[in-house]
Design a protein with these regions (language model features):
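Short hydrophobic patches on amphipathic alpha-helices
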Residues: 52-55, 187, 227
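Short, intrinsically disordered, charge-balanced linker/junction segments flanking boundaries
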Residues: 221-229
């Protein structure tokens, strides 16, 4: 997939977001001006300031980060994590952060799930960083008259290497069976415009990006099989 193709896909998505269509939720007022999507920045936010200046954003614009943002990777109170959060907090934009396999769960950092008026759904955030929202797994959000279901988490293919090197790895990176059942019970039969995930359904795995030297037969596909449903 080329950069041009991805740009065209994002352009088509933005065009769809400008059209109202009913989903499972039906709110008559959208407080969000624009929705952007990006993933796997892994703690690199050097682009954010220029992006906000170019797009002339405000905190009523939402950037969805589809996993592995780095904002909940280093640990609460750690210098690197605080620096990244400070950078994002200073940017005139709201981030809706979906959990990746290299992200800690917000609840593990002392946050609680609560209603947010801007994205019209339940999410996590720290009071000192009100424009950094962490999406709940299996939560629905309503922006630009469209519904967004977020399902975070994935299996780390480099899990054993990380453990061997004593690098950060989160044992609850995948959804539990109970969490999967709850998502199915909550939203089965309910229309949603977009499902934002970190990993892909099994039939849509980007096999051309698989890491060389890793035996795929020993890699957990629980999340991919679940999303395939």
């Amino acid at each position: 997939m080329t950069a041009t193709t991805i740009k065209e896909m994002l352009h088509d998505l933005q065009s769809e977001l400008d059209q109202k269509s009913p989903g499972c939720l039906d709110y008559s007022i959208s407080k969000v001006n624009r929705v952007y999507i990006r993933g796997d920045v892994h703690g690199n936010f050097d682009w954010l300031k220029d992006f906000c200046e170019r797009e002339n954003t405000t905190t009523n614009d939402v950037m969805i980060l589809a996993g592995d943002s780095g904002l909940l990777f280093y640990g609460k109170g750690k210098t690197r994590e605080k620096l990244l959060k400070d950078i994002c907090h200073q940017a005139p934009i709201t981030l809706l952060v979906v959990r990746g396999n290299h992200d800690n769960r917000p609840i593990n950092e002392g946050m609680t799930l609560r209603w947010n008026d801007l994205v019209q759904g339940n999410c996590y955030w720290e009071d000192e960083y009100p424009n950094i929202l962490y999406a709940g797994d299996g939560e629905m959000y309503w922006m630009r008259y469209k519904s967004f279901l977020t399902i975070g988490g994935a299996y780390s293919v480099d899990k054993f290497y990380r453990l061997h090197m004593h690098w950060t790895w989160y044992p609850d990176e995948e959804l539990t069976d109970e969490e999967m059942r709850k998502i199915l019970n909550d939203w089965s039969g309910c229309e949603t415009d977009y499902i934002i995930t970190h990993t892909a359904p099994l039939d849509h795995e980007p096999t051309w990006l698989f890491m060389q030297g890793i035996d795929q037969t020993v890699i957990s596909k629980r999340m991919e099989k679940f999303l395939q449903r």
